Amino acid sequence: MPKLKTKSSVKKRFSVTATGKIKSTQSAKRHGMTKRSKRSIRVQRGTAIMNSSDSRIVKLFMPYSR
């Protein structure tokens, strides 16, 4: 059986924790940050854990990181 390929776009955007959760950077922080509060800008710096319904889809594209 041939090896399965990992999607390059998913490989660059997401990482898997030791417990199997999918971790990514926060979205919606490219432009228009002047009208947001300082707290929301500060929160956007960190990473986010995806919920289980979305992480199932991402795990399909990363076959060897389970």
Swiss-Prot record:
GO CC annotation terms, alphabetical: cytosolic large ribosomal subunit
Composition-biased stretches (Basic residues): 28-40
Segments of this protein annotated with the region Disordered: 20-40
Pfam family, one: Ribosomal_L35p
GO MF term set: structural constituent of ribosome
Keywords noted in UniProt: Ribonucleoprotein, Ribosomal protein
Gene Ontology biological process: translation
Stated family: Belongs to the bacterial ribosomal protein bL35 family.
HAMAP family: Ribosomal_bL35 (MF_00514)
NCBIfam families: rpmI_bact
Name of the featured protein: Large ribosomal subunit protein bL35
Organism of this sequence: Ehrlichia chaffeensis (strain ATCC CRL-10679 / Arkansas)
Lineage, uppermost ranks: Bacteria, Pseudomonadati, Pseudomonadota, Alphaproteobacteria, Rickettsiales
